[in-house]
From Swiss-Prot:
Family classification: Belongs to the MutH family.
Keyword DNA repair: yes
Manganese as UniProt keyword: no
One Pfam family linked to the record: MutH
Protein name: DNA mismatch repair protein MutH
Function in brief: Sequence-specific endonuclease that cleaves unmethylated GATC sequences. It is involved in DNA mismatch repair.
Location(s) in or outside the cell: Cytoplasm
Cellular component GO terms, alphabetical: cytoplasm
Cystine crosslinks: none
Listed InterPro entries: DNA_mismatch_repair_MutH (IPR004230), DNA_rep_MutH/RE_typeII_Sau3AI (IPR011337), DNA_rep_MutH/T2_RE_sf (IPR037057), Restrct_endonuc-II-like (IPR011335)
One annotated GO biological process: mismatch repair
Amino acid sequence: MSQPRPLLSPPETEEQLLAQAQQLSGYTLGELAALAGLVTPENLKRDKGWIGVLLEIWLGASAGSKPEQDFAALGVELKTIPVDSLGRPLETTFVCVAPLTGNSGVTWETSHVRHKLKRVLWIPVEGERSIPLAKRRVGSPLLWSPNEEEDQQLREDWEELMDMIVLGQIERITARHGEYLQIRPKAANAKALTEAIGARGERILTLPRGFYLKKNFTSALLARHFLIQ
């Protein structure tokens, strides 16, 4: 069997993207890094986004950290998801930065969250810390769009959280708010502050926040598609 090669330009169709992702299934991160001419770090402490970057190289992703989807021409977002030996997610999934000001007139339909989750290529990766990073295997990809029920669930969470932001209750939002979608601090250090609306409508400084999918959402999604018991 010939070895796969990284795509040198963005995929032109979903079929091409999925076929390339399927070729990576079963390879270890160390093998894929070596084939792409990259060095595998010992761990992810200093290179938290390394797995995502590696898979972006292999799949010809175009967006980098821009607000558009990773595969902008296809409208597809790439999400790697660390899983345990039973295929269950080990952590929440970052979606996008939560806007804390300038939210008048924003609706679920026009929101950044919905834009990012409209079409997602999920790639499970072994994530248990007992497995050295280079030995962790890439799993089977899943090309997904939210069904009506999932869209409604996410919409309700988004509306509840955005109402709290707009009404100046940002400091009262905890990770427990939202059934499937949560907001929590995004900054790596506590000095990186951003503007938000306070309880009396005044401008305050607070930690940047991000939207994350909770594990119960991604766990059900993976179980349904991969028939995990």
